[in-house]
Amino acid sequence: STYASKRAAMHPRPYLNRAESSFGGTNDLAGLPATLDIKQSPSWLEHVPGYSNLQKNSSYPSGHTTGAYSWGIALAGMIPELAPQIMARTSEAGNNRIVLGVHYPLDIMGGRIGASAQNGQYWHNEFSSSIVPAARQLRGYLTERCQADEHGSTLAACIANVKANDAGGYTNGFLDSVASEPVKDQASAVRVYTARLTYTFPQNTSQSGADFMAPRGAADVLRLAYPELHACLLYTSP
């Protein structure tokens, strides 16, 4: 849940007049414009965007992004052969929130970080009891479907035969002012996902050159992808 984080941040949504959104205190815009040129999506049949429902809901962090990454990271960890495509698709859920005008890029980054921390903790605590059985069940089901459709006797063979980890897998050619590169193969999926890790935010210069340190449990998400590596190596691998 992002409830506690949102209550602590209490940052107005980007489509609101930020000069009027002080939440009981001062609101120094630091030279930024009070309003942005955001065109709200209109209601259409049963689709109601619900902008008014979010006026008192903090933009940071993005709850939708947190939910998407919570599932996406878990799925990528269980099927690491397709992790680049899975994570690129996951990143689109957050990117779309920027396009809708209901979140800032930093909100999306916060949602991803929160979901990553949640996954790390869960994989660390429940790896043997929940993660391994779930991964075995999922991979077994996919293998059975591959065999039934005559795409290969193993999951690896199936992925290779249908080119699921390349041009035959997930693609998305849609572009907008936020999504500037199409996903057309594994290499582009990696680039798109990597770009959305920071949205061009510069690195904190005070942290430049600092040694990488993974949070406790974070490396456990890689255990199925790299079972042969010692845990100490995972904890020191960016």
Question: What positions do the PLM features span?
Answer:
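Conserved small/polar residues in nucleotide/adenosyl-binding loops
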Residues: 235-238
